[in-house]
Each structure stands twice: as C-alpha cells, then as structure tokens.
C-alpha cells in the first residue's frame, strides 16, 4: 500500500515536470496559463499515477465499506459539529505555517481558488475532489481497513495531507 502511494507521488512529479517543460516549449512562454498548469500537473496524476498506484495496491485485500443508515437530522447535527473543528484546524494550520515561515507563508491554494476561472472550476471543484475521494477514501481506506477503521481513516487523512504539502490545509 505504502509503495503504491509513494510510487504515485514519484510518477506524478516526474511526469508533471516533463509535461510542464514541454508546455513551456510549445507555448513559448515563461509563465504558463492556468489551463496549462492544470494539464501539466493533474493529467499525469489522474490518468497515470493514481491508476498505477491502485494496480500496485491491488494485491492488498480490500474490505468493503459498511453501510449505515443515517437520518437527515443526525447528518445535519454531525455536519454542524464539523464546522468548529474545521475552523480550529484552519487556525492551527495558519499558526503553524506562520510560525515555521516567520510570518511569510501564503496560502497559494486559497489565493488560486479566489480567482474565477473556468479551469479552476473544472480542476479544483469537479475533477480534484472526484479523483481525491476515489484514491484516498475508496481505494486507500478499503485497503487499510484491516488495521481498524480509525487507523484506516487516520492513515488516509495523513497521506492526503502529505500529498497536498500545504500546512494551511493539514488539519482539515
């Protein structure tokens, strides 16, 4: 499982580096437009690195997700409970990033998300969450569930945070 996930990151970075270099050459620019940045970064991840990671992890036994009934009121109650946790997590991430950078860190993901661009919607709102939920929740948790439900969730969350390499989002 770990080898598959590590290989995913290595393949992703290698292919993204090659593809972005090619796009710089083809577009004759030193500053890639948003669509080109997304194509260079996300295409190798979604179409090559993630599927290869799943193939490598394929030998590990999969334990399917159990289904639980939840009434709308219970869902709403849990949702409301999550907001303060997210806020506190955001504060911790901001304080840690500020502390470690001497106050010079900036939240590039937040800055990028604030720009309205159709490519942001496609890659940050639609494709990103779909592929990330698939790999980190479905594939990773179902393969680590044999170590316990909580362990699987924590492992998935930690790997999600490490792959994003963003202290601002680390505690979400």
Residue map of PLM features:
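Transmembrane helix-loop-helix hairpins at the membrane interface
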Residues: 120-172
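Alpha-helical transmembrane segments of polytopic integral membrane proteins
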Residues: 16, 20, 49-54, 58, ...
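Juxtamembrane helix-loop-helix connectors linking adjacent transmembrane helices
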Residues: 30-36, 63-134, 142
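Aromatic-residue detector
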Residues: 38-43, 49-53, 59, 105-108, ...
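Aromatic-anchored segments of alpha-helical transmembrane domains
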Residues: 10-18, 87, 157-165
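N-terminal, membrane-interfacial amphipathic/helix-forming hydrophobic leader that caps
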Residues: 1-84
């Amino acid at each position: 499982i770990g080898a598959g996930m590590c290989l995913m990151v290595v393949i992703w970075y290698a292919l993204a580096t090659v593809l972005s270099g090619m796009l710089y050459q083809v577009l004759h620019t030193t500053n890639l437009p948003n669509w080109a940045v997304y194509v260079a970064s996300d295409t190798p991840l979604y179409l090559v690195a993630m599927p290869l990671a799943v193939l490598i992890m394929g030998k590990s036994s999969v334990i399917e997700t159990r289904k639980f009934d939840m009434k709308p009121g219970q869902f709403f109650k849990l949702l409301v409970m999550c907001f303060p946790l997210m806020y506190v997590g955001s504060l911790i991430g901001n304080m840690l990033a500020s502390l470690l950078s001497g106050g010079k860190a900036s939240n590039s993901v937040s800055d990028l998300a604030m720009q309205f661009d159709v490519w942001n919607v496609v890659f940050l709102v639609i494709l990103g969450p779909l592929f990330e939920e698939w790999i980190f929740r479905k594939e990773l948790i179902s393969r680590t569930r044999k170590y316990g439900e909580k362990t699987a969730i924590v492992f998935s969350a930690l790997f999600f945070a490490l792959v994003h390499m963003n202290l601002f989002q680390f505690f979400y």
